[in-house]
Swiss-Prot record:
Highest taxon above the source species: Bacteria
Subcellular location: Cytoplasm
EC number: 2.4.99.17
Keywords for the protein's UniProt record, in alphabetical order: Cytoplasm, Queuosine biosynthesis, S-adenosyl-L-methionine, Transferase
Main EC class the enzyme belongs to: transferase
Pfam families: Queuosine_synth
Protein name according to UniProt: S-adenosylmethionine:tRNA ribosyltransferase-isomerase
GO annotation, biological process: queuosine biosynthetic process; tRNA wobble guanine modification
Amino acid sequence: MRVADYSFELPDELIARYPTAERTASRLLSLDGNSGQLADLQFTDILEQVNPGDLMVFNNTRVIPARMFGTKQSGGKLEILVERMLDDKRVLAHVRCSKSPKVDSIVCLDGGYEMVMLARHDALFELSLQSDKTILEVLEEVGHMPLPPYIDRPDEDADKERYQTVYNQNPGAVAAPTAGLHFDDAILAALKAKGVNTAFVTLHVGAGTFQPVRVDNILDHKMHSEWAEVPQTVVDLIGETKARGNRVIAVGTTSVRSLESAAKASQGVLQSFSGDTDIFIYPGYQFQVVDAMVTNFHLPESTLIMLLSAFAGFDEVKNAYQHAIAQKYRFFSYGDAMFVTKKAN
C-alpha cells in the first residue's frame, strides 16, 4: 500500500485560486463506483443524481478567521494559525516565525491584543488570550480567512463569504468542508422540493487536512485528530432512510468521516457520537453508513484521495482523475466537484 500510488501530475493552471462567480456554476463529474462509468455534468445536475427519500448529510462547521499576525517580545514577526479553540481564551496553534516563542513569553497581535505562550505540544503551541474578549471575538476582529497554501494568494474580503458554506452554524473549522461550497439556498430548496431529506453533522476541519503524508507505506501514517459530532436525530434519520431502501449521501469527506467514525465507535451499529476522531479510511475499509458522496478533487498523495479510492475503487478513481485533468476540471478547494456512488464490497 504505497503512498506513491496516489500521485498524479496536475498542471498548475487547473488549481482553482478563486471560486466561480456563482456557487452552483461549477462542473460536476459523476462516477459510478460499480461500473466506473463517468459523466460530465454541471453542478445543478446533482438534482438528477438524487432520488426522493434519499438523505443528504452536510457538515455545518463554520470556518473561523484562524490566521493572525503579530510580533514576539523581541520584535520578530510571527504568524499564528489556530488549529483548535480549547475554551474561550486558549487555543492550540501553529506558529510560524524565525525562532519558536518560549514558554511564558508574550505574543503581541495586530489590534493590540496579547497572548501568553503556555506550553508546546509537539508541533503545536498552547496560547492564552490576555483580554476581556473571547478568542472568537478577537479572531473575528483581527483574524484572516485561512486559505489553503495551494491557493497561493492573500485572503480577500470575498473569501469571508465564499470560503464558507451557506448553512454553516458551529464555529471551529480552520479549513472549509469544500464540497458544501457548491450549494446555495436555491439548490437546497430544489432538493427539498424533490423530496430529498437533509441532515447536519459537525466536524471541525483542522489544518492537518492539508498536511502531506510523509511516509512511504499508507499503514505507517498517523492521522491527525479532529472534533466531530453526529446527533441522535441524524442517526434516526439514517435508520429510516436505510429501512426505506434509500441512500445516505454524504456531502464532503468530512461528513463521510463523521458518519463512519460514529459507526466505528459503536462497533458498526450507528449511534450518536461526540468527540475526537482520527479515523483513516483507505482501500480495504468497509463502509458502514455512506452510499454516495459529493466531493471536490483532492491533492495527490492525500488521505482524501485514499478515502475516495476506498469508496469507489482505486482504478476507477485513478481513471476519473485522468479524465478530469484531460477535460480541464478545476481542482481543490475552490474547484469543481464529483458525485460518486459506492463500489460494492
